[in-house]
């Protein structure tokens, strides 16, 4: 490339050329591979999606969970991954459980779950009214994870396909964590990742206001009950509300009346205004 550009007017050896490229940062970094964090081909028991039309109206009614990867750079060219498990309260937007792990083993999501369970430690199993929603990854379908949820009276909900929108709120907190709270940070080991995540979670829960909870912080929203004014509403919630309003029958709507002449036995009501 050098010889073609300068036509050999300035002779340069291979090693000298490599030194110049290194000095001025001209090396092309290879595209980073992205690890797959969800394996839904495990053959373990899975559960139906319970939250398709569900909007929580109090804290600890719906937790959403997911796993994302974090990059660790050992030097300028070599990297590895660690994995962040997060559990978010869907009502207050509060991160209630998290754990950074070296592998995708279920032990790390379980640690995040155990952290979240401290919130309901004083609530009897009979009084728990909570849904845990996740993808169908082997970590969440593992026997131990499922057993812990059942032990605490928590209903289990899972996505029914590969569409990220089925777990959009969890996907969104992953994006916020990586591309906002930890943006521009470089990590050399898992301890640095853990410390940074701990600081980011504290800031997110206690200082960062959210338009989706009336510009409160998640810690403040966690003290509320009932509908919170939203200055920003997710597409999922808009869709649910539209479906619910579509299904509402007006008070003055006339019921279908029996009609012996039709196979169905029903006929549409007569609109009095047209008589």
Regions found by a protein language model. Give the residues of each.
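An active-site-proximal beta-strand-loop segment
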Residues: 52, 56-96
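C-terminal domain-tail junction helix/linker
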Residues: 143, 150-154, 176-275
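Acidic/histidine-rich, metal-coordinating catalytic segments
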Residues: 124-142, 160-164, 214-219
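Basic, flexible linker segments flanking DNA-binding modules
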Residues: 1-59, 163, 217-228
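RNase H-like polynucleotidyl transferase catalytic core
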Residues: 30-36, 132-136, 150-169, 185-190
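Anionic group-transfer/hydrolysis microenvironments
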Residues: 68, 91, 99, 137, ...
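Active-site beta-loop-alpha junctions of metal-dependent nucleic acid enzymes
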Residues: 80, 98-124, 141
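Mobile genetic element proteins and their domesticated derivatives, centered on retroelements
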Residues: 1, 17, 21, 51, ...
């Amino acid at each position: 490339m050098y010889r073609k550009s300068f036509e050999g007017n300035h002779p340069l050896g291979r090693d000298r050329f490599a030194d110049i490229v290194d000095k001025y940062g001209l090396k092309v970094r290879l595209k980073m591979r992205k690890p797959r964090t969800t394996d839904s081909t495990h053959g373990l028991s899975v559960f139906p999606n319970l939250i398709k039309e569900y909007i929580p109206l109090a804290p600890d009614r719906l937790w959403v969970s997911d796993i994302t990867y974090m990059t660790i750079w050992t030097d300028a060219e070599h990297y590895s991954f660690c994995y962040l498990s997060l559990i978010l309260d869907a009502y207050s937007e509060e991160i209630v459980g998290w754990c950074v792990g070296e592998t995708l083993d279920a032990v790390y999501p379980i640690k995040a779950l155990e952290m979240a369970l401290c919130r309901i430690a004083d609530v009897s199993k009979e009084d728990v009214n909570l849904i845990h929603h996740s993808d169908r990854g082997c970590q969440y379908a593992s026997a131990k994870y499922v057993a812990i949820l059942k032990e605490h009276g928590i209903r289990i909900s899972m996505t029914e396909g590969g569409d990220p929108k089925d777990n959009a709120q969890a996907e969104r907190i992953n994006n916020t964590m990586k591309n906002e709270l930890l943006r521009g940070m470089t990590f050399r080991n898992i301890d640095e990742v853990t410390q940074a995540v701990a600081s980011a979670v504290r800031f997110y829960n206690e200082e960062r206001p959210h338009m989706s909870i009336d510009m409160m912080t998640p810690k403040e929203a966690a003290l509320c009950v009932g509908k919170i004014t939203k200055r920003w509403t997710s597409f999922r919630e808009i869709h649910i509300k539209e479906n619910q309003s579509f299904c509402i029958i007006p008070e003055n709507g006339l019921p279908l009346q029996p009609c012996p002449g039709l196979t169905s036995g029903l006929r549409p009501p007569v609109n009095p205004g047209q008589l």
